[in-house]
C-alpha cells in the first residue's frame, strides 16, 4: 500500500510528458502543413499572379491543357497496365532475383539434406570489368522481409557494382518465393554458414570473405558471424535493426512509428493468426503493406503523380522498381513467429538469448572480425538507435570493446531513407564505394569504436573524389548522443513483451484450433491472390478483358502527342494541387504517428510504471561487478609472468577456445 502514492506519481508524470509531447508533435505537423501550402501557392499560383501575360492566357490555354491531360492519362494507365502484365510474367517465371548482373548458381540449398529455399550465386562481372580471384570475396545477403532478393545489386551503381569494379569476386545469397516445408531461421543460418565455407573453398588464397547484410540480412549476417566466427571476415551491415526497442522519443518532428506497431496490435499473435489463415504460410505482402503505410503520401499519391506528370520519360524507371516492389515472397509460420517473438518483441539477439542449431547460445562478443555499421538519420524503419544501441548492450564500455580486441566502425548518413541505403546510386558511389576501399584500413585499426567520416573533394573536371577519416569515439559519449532520453523510453517494451506472451498463449489455446480448421490450401491461395497489393496489379492487366482497348489507344496517342512544358501556367496550378494533396497526406501521417506514440506510452508506459518498475529497481539495486575485479581474474593476472613460451601459448589457446569447443589449428 505504501507504494501506491509513488506509482500514482510516476503515472501522472508520464501522462503529463506524453500529453506535452503529443501537443508538440501536432503543433509541429500543423506548422509544416501551413508552410508547405504557403510555399506551393507562392511558387505556382503566386508566380502566375505576378505575370499578367500568363494570367490573361489561362483562358486560351485550356484546350491545349485538356489535350495534354487526356494524353497523359492514357499513357499513365497504359504504364499501370504494363505493370500488371509485368507482375503476372514475373509470377509465372517464379519471381527470379531482380539483379542487374548476370549470375550462375553455386549452391542450391533446396537440395541439401535439410533443405531451405536459399541459394548462393556467383555474380558474373560485366564486360570490361576484371576480377582478381585472389582478392577478398564479397558475400551479399539481401533482406527477406516481404520482397524478393536483388536490391543489393539492383543497378550498376550498387553494392555489387562497386565491389566488382574494385576487382573483388562477388557472391549473392538469394531466396526463392516458397519456403521449404518445416524450414526455420536457424536452418537458414546454418545454410548461410555452408555458403561462406564454400566461398572460402573457391578462394583458398584470399582473405576471409566480407559479409554484407542489408536490413534483415544484417542481423542474419551477425547471427552467421556469431555462430561461425572463424570463417567470416569483416561484416558490413546496412540499415539493419539490432536493438529492436530503440528509437528517438523526444527528438525529431515525428518518431519512429514502426517500433510501436507490435505493441498496439497486442504483440506477436497477429502474425500467427495471419499464418494460420494462410495454411501455415505467412504472406510477405503484409510486411510490404506495413512499409507502405509509413508514407501514405508516396504510396497513394506521389509515386503515381510523378509518373503522370512525367509520363513521357518516367515509365521505364517506374516499371523497373515496381518489378522488385511487387514481388511478394512467403515465409513459414515458424519463421515469422521466430522473428517476431525473438527479435521484434523479444529483443533477444544482443542478449545472448538465441540458441543455434548446435545447441549453444549465440554471443555477439564471439565475433572477432571488424564490424561496420551504416545507418541513416532519415531512416524511419531502422533508426540509428536500433542500428547502434546493441553495441552498448553487448559491450557496456569502450574498455570492454578494446579488451575483447574488437573494431567497430559507425557511418551515419544524415537524410537518406531506408530504401535509399540500398537503392540510391549516389549512396552506392559514395558510402558503399568508400566502405569497399577502406576495409583494409579498418582491419588495421587498433581495437576500439570509430566514426567514419567521408569528405567530398571537388576535382577540376567536376567529378567528386572522397577522402575517409576514422575518428576514435567513446561508447559512453556516442550512446547518450543518440538517446537523449537515456533509453527510458525503451522500458515500456518490457510490458509489451509480457502482454505479447499472454496474448500469444491465449490465441494458441482459444482461437488457433478454429482458425486452422477454417484454413486450407485453396483458401490460402485465394487470400494471397486477393491481397490488395496483388489485386491492384493483376486487375489492370491482360486478365481484365475490359482493358483490351488501352494499348492500341496509347499507341495512337504517342503518334499524336502534344505535351505541355512543366512551366505552362496550368501545369503549375496542377503541381500546386498535387503539393496540397501531398502535404495533407503527410499531415495525416504525422498526426497518426503522434496518436500511435501517445497511445503506446499511455498504455504500456503506465503498465510498466504500475506493475514492473519496482521489480526492475530491485534487480538493479546490486551494482554490476567489473570483471577484472573478480578474485579469479585477479589471481590469473597475477600469474601471467610465470612460465615460458609453452605456458604462454597454452594460455592463449585457452583464451581463444570458445564454449569448450576445440580450437581449430588455423587459429
Regions found by a protein language model. Name each.
Residues 1-78, 201, 205, 222-337, ...:
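Alpha/beta-hydrolase-fold enzymes
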Residues 134, 143-207, 520, 558-559, ...:
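Active-site catalytic motif of lipid deacylating hydrolases and related acyltransferases
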Residues 212-221:
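Gly/Ala-rich beta-loop-alpha elbow adjacent to hydrolase catalytic centers
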Residues 228-295, 400-402, 406-412, 419-439, ...:
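A catalytic-pocket lid/entrance helix-loop region that shapes and gates access to the active site
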Residues 381-386:
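Conserved alpha/beta-hydrolase "acid-adjacent" motif
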Amino acid at each position: 500500500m505504501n507504494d501506491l502514492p509513488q506509482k500514482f506519481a510516476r503515472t501522472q508524470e508520464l501522462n503529463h510528458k506524453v500529453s506535452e509531447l503529443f501537443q508538440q508533435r501536432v503543433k509541429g505537423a500543423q506548422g509544416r502543413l501551413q508552410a508547405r501550402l504557403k510555399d506551393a501557392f507562392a511558387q505556382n499560383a503566386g508566380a502566375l499572379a505576378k505575370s499578367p501575360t500568363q494570367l490573361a492566357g489561362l483562358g486560351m490555354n485550356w484546350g491545349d491543357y485538356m489535350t495534354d491531360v487526356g494524353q497523359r492519362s492514357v499513357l499513365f494507365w497504359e504504364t499501370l497496365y504494363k505493370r500488371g502484365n509485368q507482375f503476372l510474367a514475373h509470377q509465372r517465371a517464379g519471381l527470379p532475383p531482380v539483379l542487374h548482373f548476370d549470375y550462375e548458381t553455386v549452391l542450391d540449398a533446396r537440395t541439401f539434406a535439410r533443405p531451405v529455399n536459399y541459394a548462393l550465386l556467383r555474380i558474373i562481372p560485366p564486360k570490361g570489368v576484371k576480377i582478381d580471384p585472389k582478392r577478398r570475396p564479397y558475400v551479399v545477403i539481401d533482406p527477406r522481409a516481404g520482397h524478393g532478393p536483388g536490391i543489393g545489386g539492383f543497378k550498376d551503381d550498387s553494392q555489387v557494382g562497386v565491389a566488382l569494379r574494385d576487382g573483388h569476386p562477388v557472391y549473392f545469397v538469394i531466396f526463392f518465393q516458397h519456403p521449404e516445408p518445416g524450414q526455420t531461421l536457424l536452418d537458414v543460418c546454418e545454410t548461410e554458414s555452408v555458403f561462406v565455407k564454400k566461398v572460402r573453398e573457391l578462394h583458398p588464397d584470399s582473405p576471409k570473405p566480407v559479409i554484407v547484410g542489408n536490413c534483415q540480412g544484417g542481423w542474419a549476417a551477425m547471427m552467421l558471424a556469431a555462430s561461425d566466427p572463424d570463417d567470416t571476415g569483416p561484416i558490413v551491415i546496412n540499415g539493419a535493426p539490432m536493438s529492436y526497442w530503440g528509437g528517438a522519443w523526444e527528438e525529431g518532428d515525428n518518431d519512429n512509428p514502426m517500433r510501436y506497431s507490435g505493441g498496439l496490435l497486442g504483440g506477436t499473435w497477429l502474425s500467427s493468426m495471419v499464418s494460420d489463415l494462410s495454411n501455415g504460410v505467412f504472406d510477405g505482402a503484409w510486411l510490404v503493406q506495413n512499409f507502405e503505410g509509413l508514407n501514405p503520401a508516396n504510396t497513394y499519391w506521389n509515386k503515381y503523380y510523378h509518373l503522370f506528370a512525367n509520363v513521357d520519360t518516367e515509365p521505364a524507371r517506374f516499371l523497373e522498381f515496381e518489378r522488385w516492389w511487387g514481388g511478394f515472397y512467403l515465409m513459414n509460420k515458424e519463421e515469422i513467429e521466430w522473428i517476431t517473438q525473438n527479435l521484434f518483441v523479444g529483443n533477444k539477439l544482443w542478449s545472448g538469448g538465441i540458441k543455434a542449431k548446435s545447441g549453444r547460445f549465440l554471443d555477439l562478443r564471439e565475433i572477432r572480425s571488424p564490424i561496420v555499421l551504416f545507418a541513416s538519420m532519415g531512416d524511419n524503419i531502422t533508426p540509428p538507435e536500433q542500428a547502434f544501441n546493441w553495441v552498448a548492450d553487448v559491450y557496456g564500455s569502450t574498455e570492454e570493446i578494446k579488451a575483447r580486441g574488437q573494431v567497430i566502425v559507425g557511418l551515419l548518413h544524415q537524410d537518406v531513407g531506408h530504401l535509399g541505403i540500398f537503392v540510391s546510386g549516389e549512396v552506392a558511389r559514395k558510402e558503399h564505394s568508400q566502405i569497399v576501399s577502406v576495409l583494409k584500413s579498418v582491419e588495421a585499426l587498433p581495437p576500439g569504436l570509430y566514426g567514419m567520416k567521408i569528405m567530398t573533394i571537388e576535382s577540376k573536371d567536376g567529378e567528386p573524389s572522397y577522402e575517409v577519416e576514422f575518428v576514435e569515439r567513446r561508447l559512453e559519449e556516442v550512446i547518450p548522443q543518440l538517446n537523449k532520453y537515456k533509453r527510458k523510453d525503451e522500458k515500456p517494451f518490457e510490458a509489451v513483451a509480457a502482454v505479447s506472451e499472454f496474448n500469444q498463449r491465449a490465441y494458441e489455446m482459444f482461437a488457433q484450433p478454429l482458425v486452422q480448421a477454417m484454413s486450407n490450401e485453396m483458401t490460402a491461395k485465394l487470400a494471397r491472390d486477393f491481397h490488395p497489393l496483388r489485386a491492384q496489379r493483376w486487375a489492370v492487366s491482360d486478365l481484365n478483358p475490359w482493358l483490351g482497348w488501352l494499348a492500341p489507344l496509347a499507341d495512337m496517342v504517342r503518334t499524336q502527342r502534344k505535351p505541355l512544358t512543366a512551366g505552362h501556367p496550368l501545369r503549375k496550378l496542377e503541381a500546386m494541387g498535387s503539393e496540397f494533396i501531398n502535404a495533407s497526406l503527410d499531415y495525416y501521417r504525422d498526426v497518426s504517428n503522434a496518436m500511435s506514440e501517445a497511445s503506446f506510452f499511455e498504455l504500456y508506459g503506465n503498465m510498466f510504471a504500475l506493475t514492473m518498475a519496482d521489480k526492475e529497481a530491485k534487480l538493479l539495486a546490486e551494482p554490476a561487478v567489473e570483471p577484472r575485479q573478480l578474485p579469479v581474474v585477479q589471481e590469473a593476472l597475477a600469474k601471467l609472468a610465470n612460465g615460458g613460451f609453452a605456458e604462454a601459448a597454452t594460455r592463449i589457446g585457452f583464451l581463444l577456445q570458445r564454449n569448450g569447443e576445440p580450437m581449430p589449428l588455423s587459429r
